[in-house]
Amino acid sequence: MQRPIVYVGMSADLIHPGHINILSRAAELGDITIGLLTDAAIASYKRLPHMTYEQRKAVVENLKGVASVVPQRTLDYAENLRTVRPDFVVHGDDWQTGVQRHTRERVIEVLSEWGGKLVEIPYTPGISSTRLHSSVKEVGTTPNVRLSRLRRLLDSKDIVRILEVHNGLTGLIIENSKVTVDNQAREFDGMWSSSLTDSLARGKPDTEAVDVSSRLQMVNELFEVTTKPLVFDGDTGGKPEHFGFTVRSLERLGVSAVIVEDKEGLKRNSLFGTDVPQTQSSVEDFSERIRIGKRAQITDDFMVIARIESLILEKGMADAVHRAEAYVDAGADGIMIHSRQSDPAEIFEFCRYFDKLPRRVPLVVVPTSYSSVRESELADAGVNMVIYANHLMRAVYPQVTKVVQSILQHGRAHEAESMLASIKDALSIIPENAG
């Protein structure tokens, strides 16, 4: 006699006694089919899992009582349930409230089509995946794990969200900041090491005046207190014969990607556009720079992303699209298209042309000038990564200036207190301060 089919949906990133309890109870009902959530399914409502889908599958299919494992590509069980048509779905009772309650209602609705039943197991007290993930985060990460995370994010999310960082404190803020929007957790996926804000933090001009070694020291300090992936602003990449060494150094630290722009000569900030002299590299010279970077890297995970300045320098859309195709052919792992217009119209136009190219790589934008555009609009246009490139430094400057002026004006600090964090809050930024 054939045993009943029991469907259990799982992320299975960190297996704990609560999972084993559910599987043991499910095995009493019949043969277990695991609907293993893909990386994309998990990333749609919380952080990317530590282990890849294939790694998690290798663990789950060897658990006692598991008869088969199938990928579950969305948080919604409906498609898999209609394919498998299980007699039972088994789940912990912790999904009766919160972000998954609508998923639960949908499961009950679909099961009713053939008389299947939902069996809910009481939550195992004292342990949860969330707590375990927090503990893992406290331990930290390794260079290889951090480095590979960006490619996994690009493969798993509609759009990857990156924010500028210029010291360990801003790194901690990005690491720990999270909001809930429409019952889903939202956080930044990674960090951007900006040459502009690195320079400003040192009181120097944004002309590549801060050498790569000095910037790498900041990256090293940042990596001591964070776990998220980092994208490095490589400016022009320096001399072509030096770029390969830069790539090796970044990769060794665990940086996930370098973005290098197709300009040459004295570096000036792109947002000046044609108001200052700026020279764009030839397609041939910059393509060779990309090839130098790709030849230098050791792993397959590190990304060399080509930044196109054609729209900034008013060279036209055709030139930008031509360069994109040439840079992809040269081996670029991604394309960043830059614009200083106040609306995203030319970015959207570029996206339409870019999607028609023979080879497609991730597309990156930096909406500094056209800040009114929403991430959802960019994702719909085909953008894969959005970088908020200078916002934490720009947030610091006006507030610090106000505090300085207030103390000077009043001859005391009392009037500035409303603009300051309390001593208690300032100390709590670093938990170890509490002893």
Swiss-Prot record:
Its cofactor is a divalent metal cation. Its EC number is 2.7.7.104, 5.4.2.9. One of its GO terms (molecular function) is phosphoenolpyruvate mutase activity. Keywords: Antibiotic biosynthesis, Cobalt, Isomerase, Multifunctional enzyme, Nucleotidyltransferase, Pyruvate, Transferase. In the N-terminal section; belongs to the cytidylyltransferase family. The active site is at 206 (nucleophile). Disruption phenotype: Deletion mutant does not produce fosfomycin. GO terms for biological process: antibiotic biosynthetic process. It comes from Streptomyces wedmorensis. Bifunctional enzyme that catalyzes two steps during fosfomycin biosynthesis. It catalyzes the conversion of phosphoenolpyruvate (PEP) to phosphonopyruvate (PnPy), the first step of the pathway. It also catalyzes the cytidylylation of the 2-hydroxyethylphosphonate (HEP) intermediate to produce cytidylyl-2-hydroxyethylphosphonate (HEP-CMP), the fourth step of the pathway. Contains an N-terminal cytidylyltransferase (CyTase) domain and a C-terminal phosphoenolpyruvate phosphomutase domain. Pathway: Antibiotic biosynthesis; fosfomycin biosynthesis. Residues 1-139 are annotated as: Cytidylyltransferase. The CyTase reaction requires a divalent metal ion. Highest activity is observed with Co(2+), but it can also use Mg2(+), Ni2(+), Fe2(+) or Mn2(+). The gene is fom1. Cytidine 5'-{[hydroxy(2-hydroxyethyl)phosphonoyl]phosphate} binds at residues 11-12, 45-46, 77, 91-94, 100, 124-127. This is Fosfomycin biosynthesis bifunctional protein Fom1. It catalyses: 2-hydroxyethylphosphonate + CTP = cytidine 5'-{[hydroxy(2-hydroxyethyl)phosphonoyl]phosphate} + diphosphate; phosphoenolpyruvate + H(+) = 3-phosphonopyruvate. Residues 140-435 are annotated as: Phosphoenolpyruvate phosphomutase.
